[in-house]
Amino acid sequence: KTAIKPGAPREIFEIQPLSQAKYVVSYYTGAILDLNQHATLLVFDSLWGGDSHGILYRDLREKKGICYYVDSQLDRFSGVLYTMVGCSHSDFSVVSNSIEQALCHMRSEQFSMENLVHSKALIKNRLISAFHDRDLNLRILLSSIITEYNVELDRLSECVDRVTIGDISLLAKSLIKGVEYFLHDQ
């Protein structure tokens, strides 16, 4: 069951004195009910903006040079993927439109197999590290108890191997845009 229910997309603008604006857009992923879906979401997050080879990082930071940082984060408890961007106030429209355009590219499979392979390798390395991280193992155990969804790291790693470009595209098509939050100065 998803903790947060998708509703109509909302925009929230907040003004405070600061040196750079922060833009956060959420996408509802729905409940993560099995290891295949979990693996696809982990790979999507890495491809999207969760790593330096991510589509948004390369487009917004390296290609266009309009943001200070780009990140994405999956909250599997609430079924939400957050995309965070630090940018100047004047670049809000360009950033927002670029994110929408990048999602359209993901939906139509317009990303390279090389990036998919890279993302899968990163996720698998993190899962290997997780085997030896006591705190992470405790968090996984607690989340398994809370959600009644057992995360077996070795099986999750096998599922990551099987994620395809088509899986990523289907996931991108299923995302529902949620709240957009823009914190900026005047």
List PLM regions with ranges:
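Alpha-helix boundary/capping and short turn/kink residues
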Residues: 53, 108-109, 150, 165
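M16/insulysin-pitrilysin zinc metalloprotease superfamily fold
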Residues: 71-130
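Regulatory input/activation interfaces that engage signals or partners
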Residues: 39
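Non-catalytic beta-strand/loop surface segments
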Residues: 1-35, 46-97, 156-179, 186
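C-terminal regions of mature proteins
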Residues: 117-186
